């Protein structure tokens, strides 16, 4: 009698298990497959470039990531994602440039730029960091700064910063990388800590939206500008050749190759 009860109990348990398995299969068969395109899916770290050699000290901040060049005392590159929501920030602009506490070795101070003839040129702009007090303050670390021609800093470079915020509002977000270019033409240093003056600057911007996909490369000589932004346009491939960096490598290869070889004639 005891064995019969055990068999009945086992049979009931097995039947319940079979019912659960069948129900699970039926429910999952009704789930639609994911069809989101690459442009619609967020890709973490899309803006972080890959250095082919001579990678600097990586420093991650609230609003950006940079690779610091201890030899030239400037960043190699600064990268960040700017979203539509972040462009709505109301945080007041900081005015205090400070040494970066996380830089290893010699730290650049604001006085290195005093009476140098060059601006303290932001790479990741303060205007992109208004969404966070901490992000705003960190944008004034000297590791995010390069000696920059005053007219370039306040005019064409600034115009591209404003245009980038416009694209972020229009397309939801943009991925940005910028930094100095040293070509060995200029052998100029400023300040007690010998900050090297860049020959030029680059900026690459990725718009990866279902409505618009493009990668823009910009090349600026470190001199007075006041020219249309279209005149600074080049391909991202050209910037990669100049810098030895691989941009937007998280994109599928075919898409990356197509976007990065194109030189746009007009801005989005």
Located regions from the model:
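Domain-level detector for secreted/extracellular nuclease and nuclease-toxin modules, and
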Residues: 2-268
């Amino acid at each position: 009698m005891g064995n019969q009860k055990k068999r009945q109990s086992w049979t009931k348990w097995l039947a319940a298990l079979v019912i659960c398995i069948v129900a699970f299969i039926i429910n999952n068969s009704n789930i639609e497959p994911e069809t989101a395109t690459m442009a619609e899916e967020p890709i973490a770290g899309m803006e972080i470039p890959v250095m082919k050699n001579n990678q600097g000290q990586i420093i991650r901040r609230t609003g950006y990531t940079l690779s610091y060049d201890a030899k030239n005392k400037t960043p190699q590159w600064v990268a960040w994602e700017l979203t539509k929501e972040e462009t709505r920030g109301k945080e007041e602009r900081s005015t205090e440039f400070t040494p970066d506490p996380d830089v290893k070795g010699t730290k650049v101070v604001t006085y290195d730029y005093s009476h140098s003839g060059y601006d303290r040129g932001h790479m990741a702009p303060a205007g992109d960091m208004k969404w966070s007090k901490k992000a705003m303050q960190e944008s004034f670390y000297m590791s995010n700064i390069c000696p920059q021609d005053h007219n370039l800093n306040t005019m064409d470079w600034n115009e591209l910063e404003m245009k980038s915020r416009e694209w972020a509002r229009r397309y939801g977000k943009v991925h940005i990388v910028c930094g100095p270019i040293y070509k060995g033409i200029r052998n100029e240093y400023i300040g007690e800590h010998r900050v090297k003056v860049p020959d030029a600057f680059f900026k690459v911007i990725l718009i990866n939206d279902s409505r618009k996909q493009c990668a823009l490369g910009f090349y600026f000589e470190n001199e007075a500008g006041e020219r249309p932004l279209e005149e600074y346009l080049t391909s991202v491939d050209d910037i990669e050749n100049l810098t030895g960096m691989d941009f937007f490598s998280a994109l599928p290869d075919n898409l990356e190759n197509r976007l990065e070889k194109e030189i746009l004639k007009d801005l989005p």
